[in-house]
Amino acid sequence: MMLYECGIRYERTMPNGMSKKVTELYLVDACSFAEAEGRITKEMEPYISGDFDVVTIKRTNYSEIVENGADSADKWFKAKLMFVTFDEKTSKEKKQAVYFIVKASDINNAHTVVVQHMKTSFVDYEIATLDETKIMDLFRYEVNTTSSNG
């Protein structure tokens, strides 16, 4: 599976009663662009009254989804980690960039969540960047476990 970033454009009623076209970003776990479009359309239908358009779909480079599980975690952060390895052929340190999508309440919490997540890893790493994204939510792929044994 791969995460796709989908942009949804729709008309939202603002607090002052006026309507305004807005675009929101969501992540969808899917196998292809076509599946990502179908899934985001299905996921958004219950939440948006009226028409909406899927205006963008792009692949992301996230290798892991890291969540802290707290109800207060309502923001998504992009973490760039540098995995540090030793190349025995050249006798030099090598750094490889790896990207995580992290759900947390704020940037300090996101840092803590990444550190906690990496405690079980044997890889040396550095957190190179940690930035808040405009992503509203993530829709994971769910396997249908119900069977129909007639």
State what each model feature region is:
Residues 2-8, 24-27, 36, 40, ...:
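Short, structured motif recognition centered on aromatic/hydrophobic residues
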Residues 66-72, 139-150:
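Short, low-order "capping/linker" segments at domain edges
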Residues 29-64:
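Short, well-structured hydrophobic secondary-structure segments
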Residues 99-139:
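Mixed-charge, glycine-accented linear interaction segment located at domain edges/termini
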Residues 11, 31, 80-85, 103, ...:
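Extracellular/lumenal glycan-associated surfaces
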Residues 11-27, 46-49, 92-100, 122, ...:
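A cross-kingdom feature marking solvent-exposed beta-strand/loop segments within repeated
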Residues 1-21, 72-95:
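Short aromatic-glycine-(Arg/Gly/Cys) micro-motifs in beta-strand/loop hairpins
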Residues 57-68, 132-140:
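Short amphipathic beta-strand and strand-loop transition segments with alternating hydrophobic
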